[in-house]
Amino acid sequence: MSGDPGLEALKARVAEVPLGPEIEETGRIATLADGLVEVEGLPGARLGEVVRFAGGAEGLVLTLDPETVQVALLDPGAALGSGTEVRRTGQLLSVPVGQGLLGRVVDPLGRPLDGLPAILPEARLEIERPAPGIVDRDMVAEPVETGLLVVDALFAVGRGQRELIIGERATGKTSLAVDAIVNQAASDIVCFYVAIGQRTTAVRRVIETVREKGAFARTVFVVAPATASPGLRWIAPFAATSMAEWVRDRGGHALIVYDDLTKHAAVHRELALLARQPPGREAYPGDIFYLHARLLERSAKLSAVNGGGSLTALPIAEIEAGNLSAYIPTNLISIADGQIVTSAALFAANQRPAVDIGLSVSRVGGKAQRGALKAVAGRVRLDYAQYLEMKMFSRFGGFGDAALRARLARGERIGALLAQPRTTPLSTPVQVALLAALAEGALDDVPLEDLTRLKAALGPVLAADASLGPFCAAPDRLEPETRAALLACVRRAREAP
């Protein structure tokens, strides 16, 4: 009997059963206000631990005091009051991850908001995870193609980059990010859209837009609207990042949009003030920079040894009266690898996307830009900036010099090329063809109103040219014969009815 494998396995399982007394730590609610609970009697509680209230509601331990702990409610509808019993779970907050999240709308805890069955997770990950170390990362060298000419040509975004989208209210910030998501419908990038404190109607419009454009099945929506508890809004970006890291850590590629971190900073301030933490500049607590730094540092391009996956972040921030030097905007600008600034003046002038060329920058994306696009986009930004300056001075009097008039006309065409309606992405070959034609002067005699039609007609013309098949599949180099073929396609597109 002693050699029976089944008996030995049973003995091993019995040995694992704890035979001592089970110790359970319990406490009671001392005070309750605005989604934050002060609990007495949990001396062993840890930061980030989940506690459970009588009745099943859960909360997240945010701060530890000598006699009490501050707990953020994760179930705002729970019926709680002073004296309600609270128990430790001993577990840090985690969220479900896996392929089952694709095409779903969930809250930050992974609970469905779309009326469909519960998510069947492949694993669970803690919401607070360390960022990849220096040796675990690789250089940003592959592009995230947004389909927006102004971004891909002038401020390229690379896989693993953090590119901030910042501007005043209602200047097209979310539209830029949604366009980037829509353009991944046929790519290998999985998208995550995180709504933090947004209006439910605005989130619904985003979801419907992504659905209509065919990218819904490759997108995960993590929604903590303005009506959600402060605790849920606070954990939303961290929870969604863990969901996206599951894709990255398996060698995949993910794109995450945080909409927006200004509202996240506001809810962090709200919880800190309720917890009686000392206020600092603009009443934010002292750890506000660390809050967003530890979040955005989790976006990275991993080395080949670690699978070669990537997580690209497009955080969104809102400013007031064009003030980029406010506290939260300067924090985010210093953390990110560049920023795309939207302008209220350009938006009012009907320029879409309303990107401010002079204030926007991509610090590392240039290394990831397609070689062919880099070859034709070199002078576009400088020429357009000079045009904007000359345009301002031209209001005071006409330019008699023919060369200056030609530069003004060229600038107008650059502006018309960069203008792009929502959810109408341009492929990289089309972008290269347009900019090559611009550089060669092939668009100088094209009326501005015809450029929109030309951009729409050029894609099918390129696809029909068999000689451009290899280039369209991998537009990494622009050979002289390829440039000539692209210019010929532009001429045919101009002549198309």
Swiss-Prot record:
List the Gene3D superfamilies hit by this protein, alphabetically.
2.40.30.20, ATP synthase alpha/beta chain, C-terminal domain, P-loop containing nucleotide triphosphate hydrolases
Taken from the UniProt entry, a GO cellular component term is: plasma membrane
> Tell me, how does this one assemble?
F-type ATPases have 2 components, CF(1) - the catalytic core - and CF(0) - the membrane proton channel. CF(1) has five subunits: alpha(3), beta(3), gamma(1), delta(1), epsilon(1). CF(0) has four main subunits: a(1), b(1), b'(1) and c(9-12).
Tell me where it resides: Cell inner membrane
Q: Which gene encodes it?
A: atpA2
Write down the membrane topology. Peripheral membrane protein
Regions crossing the membrane: none
Leading EC class? translocase
Record protein name field:
ATP synthase subunit alpha 2
The reaction(s) this protein catalyses: ATP + H2O + 4 H(+)(in) = ADP + phosphate + 5 H(+)(out)
EC numbers for this chain:
7.1.2.2
